[in-house]
Amino acid sequence: MDLRGTRITVHDMTLRDGMHPKRHLMTLEQMKTIAQGLDQAGIPLIEVTHGDGLGGSSVNYGFPAHTDEEYLGAVIPLMKQAKVSALLLPGIGTVDHLKMAHELGVNTIRVATHCTEADVSEQHIRYARKLGMDTVGFLMMAHMNSPEGLVQQAKLMESYGANCIYVTDSAGHLLPDTVKARIGAVRAALKPETELGFHGHHNLAMGVANSIAAIEAGATRIDAAAAGLGAGAGNTPMEVLIAVCDLMGIETGVDVFKIQDVAEDLVVPIMDFPIRIDRDALTLGYAGVYGSFLLFAKRAEKKYGVPAREILVEMGRRGMVGGQEDMIEDTAITLAKAKQAQGVAA
């Protein structure tokens, strides 16, 4: 398909999804420096919150270095052209968090639910629309629902007032054909004026290919992160996506070289470990497991002596979804006891 002249909005995840591998401990200075670099490179929309969204600070998800208010309050006044978004998961974030974000100047709110639970987003989507915000319905773990099932969920979010719907590959499990099937079905079912977005992860090295497939099928908002900084093997690497789009004639408004410099000079130096497709991140994609489970599984491996890969495969078998981080330790204990029993029996 010839995509020359197609215009998309790239949405940066470095300062939100990138909080997962940083254990939510980015400093205000790191946030500000990276956000300014992204702004200068031409990124139009930048997400800033705890990795698990507004209100994510907790024992279950991890305590950040600063509050959402502090991060948003530091970044928003510095932006010259970029708008700032925030993620909100009903059950973690509340309407009060949403109100706070709006008062601080957040432009876009993305209300995220599991891909079969759009009904829990109604209150938050309706309130965001009442505030006049750019309101996005964000259907996570999209591989766990059929194209037809996603259509029904997307239409619910649209009926609540969402002006954009995202098909979200939280596990990095989808392939270009399965992305096209889902995006194409949802695009055909929504109102023409409702935008469609895609959020990819790079666990099977498909982030860029899947994003291009999504654009071919009608998505106009695409998520990515500088140097791929994000959960699992990271998000779609922004600098690669921008280069590929430029070669294909897809218009992003982002400077090809400036975004490379942000990735190389600002983001890579703050990584606590390389964002790459190691065997555990690959297992996330292969088994269809929620991306932010990775570090929890690695910690459980050290504590219980059960390989992270085995924990992740079992989590996939059980069909665990985002928000069930507490079950990772339980799964590790169960597997450790089973190994111990096998050892005794032997």
Swiss-Prot record:
This is 4-hydroxy-2-oxovalerate aldolase 3. Keywords: Aromatic hydrocarbons catabolism, Lyase, Manganese, Metal-binding. PANTHER family: 2-ISOPROPYLMALATE SYNTHASE 1, CHLOROPLASTIC-RELATED, HOMOCITRATE SYNTHASE-RELATED. Its EC number is 4.1.3.39. The gene is nahM. Substrate binds at residues 16-17, 170, 199, 290. The active site is at 20 (proton acceptor). SUPFAM superfamilies: Aldolase, post-HMGL domain-like. PROSITE patterns: PYR_CT (PS50991). Belongs to the 4-hydroxy-2-oxovalerate aldolase family. It catalyses: (S)-4-hydroxy-2-oxopentanoate = acetaldehyde + pyruvate. GO terms for biological process: catabolic process; L-leucine biosynthetic process. The lineage of its organism: Bacteria, Pseudomonadati, Pseudomonadota, Betaproteobacteria, Rhodocyclales. It holds the Pfam family HMGL-like. The record marks 16 as: Transition state stabilizer.
